[in-house]
Amino acid sequence: MQSMPNHAPSITPIKADLMVCPRWIIPVEPAGVVLEDHALIINSGEIVDLLPREAAAQRYVADTIETLPEHVLIPGLINTHTHAGMTLMRGIADDQPLKTWLEEWIWPLESRWVSTEMVRDGTLLACAEMLLSGVTTFNDMYFFPEAAAEAVDQSGIRASLGILAFDVPTAYGHGADDYLTRGLATRDALRNHPRLSFMLAPHAPYTVSDATFDKVATLAAQTGLGIHIHAHETQHEVDDSLHQYGERPLERLERLGILGPQTLAVHAVALNDADITLMAKHNVQVAHCPVANLKLGSGIARTTALNAAGINIGIGTDGAAGNNRLDLLSETRLAGLLAKGTQQDPGLFPAHSLIYMATLGGARALGLQDQIGSLTIGKRADLCAIALDNATTLPVFDPASQIIHAAGREHVTHVWVDGQCVVKKKHLTEISHGEIYAKAKTWENRFRG
């Protein structure tokens, strides 16, 4: 008997821009998951699928296939606090207390040199360093955000830029009203940029008046913008606030309507139990900057207590002028080690929770959790590939632990932002080394003069 021919219709493969095939994928959502031999599918800058590699090869045909046989793929890292333009001041006045560092070194230097050119050049240098370190998004607080936006546009990184409020005149503006007006105008001009968002950025309780905070609170309510502010960075700041206002900085911010789930409190080192309760009450976010806190002698943030209170924590580097590095992987590792050591509990902040803080926790802190922070279908394709085939990372029993405790930024090989490859085989694709080297040397000579 003759068999009948099989007339089952063949399935037409789905076209995509990019298929990334690493050995391991840590999607962050769902929590604690490590996928082996899977593929991530990207089209038009969006994650469209995550599935086993064999199924991906049958279902999709991609313009580019990136095979990374000994790599782990994670969401791009998110730096929740920095001053990118200050990267040109890296190493100036090291080993000084924060107040001395600011008032006797940084602010005088800024008063002479801060400009659109300085901010653009410094931010481009910062973008280069962050991209090579696996950072795909940074949250900035500095002057001339329009100049920072030029560097963001050139480099291909994603950024949340600060609309500064500061009750001191500078080359950028005559005072807080001028800063806010200029910052809002920049935001309006760039509102359609696919990789830019904005936050209101009153500098700190000790540099911003009650009247300015009232304006910031009103603007936040009107625009829906988040608020990015230094808070409780040192005990000196708390003591000065008690002397001047009769209340702790967070108490004052609550009175002025600044605290809320849209508020990102940077550093949050000098906290007592009542402060943490107050932050939890208002669902305040925290940008934890452990290296800067240690280097400037500010102290060690109570991250264990913050975490226990349900407060979301993202990781930040602060500026390279105070930290000297924009290295989020080392920052994240230190955050975990400080918690374990100070609490004498090795079980605190396991590797997956630290990766969360450096990715989705950061996205939540910036109000961008629906767009970035995890390798989830429908989110933007911001990705970081880390090679684990080096003598310093072998053998690999747990890729998540290896990222935190063995790997470093030197193991980052590929980075994508919005589906575009901005670091390929450890080389920047949008920024030339010669350009940033020349700009950095020019500013070094100016500052020395």
Each language-model region and where it sits:
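His/Asp/Glu-enriched, well-ordered alpha-helical/loop segment
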Residues: 255-262, 304-390, 406-407
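Divalent metal-coordination and catalytic microenvironments
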Residues: 23, 40, 45, 70, ...
